[in-house]
């Protein structure tokens, strides 16, 4: 027997189960959104991304029968063969042949018992029935299935995709900075005013670190703006996550006031110095720039090996009034602000438009409902006229990567404290050279004169 054949069989054993499993049951538009929806015969370029870095196929070769495997896209049968596959997706209550067999339906585990499939009823992050109702109903926003969220439980999403703990009473009651109103345009986008000084959308991954990611994102933007671009680093959310662990919960959430305390007292290095890794590990990790290193004569050492270990500090944060006009004026004058809001189960499926929380999950029962606090950057505002009725919105940058929402951004109803989006809004100024500090003090004095 040739030596090569010894190694061929194990490889085939690994490949066949993957193909035979296929991508069936993952809702969403795949073949149907291609320019040329389906391809005749075999076409290895007739693909659509699915489940992160995987590909599914829309060519007639993708379904090679039970022995040949199946790597077709989930909507292949409906789009390319015109078959109604709705009934095929129902598992719970259907008959089965072997007691003890198990299947997965989205995030649910289904077991064959007494000749019938019984699923455990776990609420999933992607709920196909809600997707369908949003698609066919009259809503101000659209929804879609995200392959990165498919197969994940709702509780898992709340735990690892959010991460801001509800502010303590003393923090909620902090004094608000009042701002003299100014003439406000119908639309404003910080990216238009400050361009490259506004940093791109982050991706917190599977770590409940929005408390860290949003704080460093706001700091990065504000430092760049107040320094007029002389400081334009993306600050390290990993350092804040790993090193600010006193009374924090790492990848299971944190308090914004303690995050701001750390960045004010010690400062945070750039992301190039201390890159983000917790999105894959689900752990905050050990602090690689301990507090004692700040007094080291040799300076801080970058975990990445970079020679640039400059640490940047911020001034004490301030709470912006919850009045719509005050938030707008602060945003247009000083840059993006940090907002905490309540994320409900349907928000995970947001694709575009002006988000307004629906009661579709509540209609199904309490087990389909969940919520948690999340913090994001607010970059601007506008008015949506697409539905025939003007809808005011806030423009926000989420931290779920650019594949989610509108390239990582979302719009949410403005002026009604929807999902508490206007209840806890934070701003801060960056610390820099003495010249910049004097500039900020003069700026503060000008603000104080406004209020006299």
UniProtKB/Swiss-Prot annotation:
InterPro entries: Papain-like_cys_pep_sf (IPR038765), Pept_asp_AS (IPR025661), Pept_his_AS (IPR025660), Peptidase_C1A (IPR013128), Peptidase_C1A_C (IPR000668), Somatomedin_B_dom (IPR001212)
Organism: Caenorhabditis elegans
Location(s) in or outside the cell: Secreted
This protein's record includes keyword Signal: yes
SMB domain sequence ranges: 34-85
Protein name: Uncharacterized peptidase C1-like protein F26E4.3
Extent of the signal sequence: 1-20
Main location: secreted
SMART domains tied to this protein: Pept_C1
Classification via Pfam families: Peptidase_C1 (PF00112)
UniProt GO molecular function: cysteine-type peptidase activity
Family designation: Belongs to the peptidase C1 family.
Assigned GO CC terms: extracellular space; lysosome
Keyword tRNA-binding in record: no
Disulphide bonds in the chain: 38-46, 38-58, 46-80, 56-58, 56-73, 62-72, 73-80
Glycan-carrying positions: 145, 232
This protein's UniProt keywords: Disulfide bond, Glycoprotein, Secreted, Signal
GO biological process, one term: proteolysis
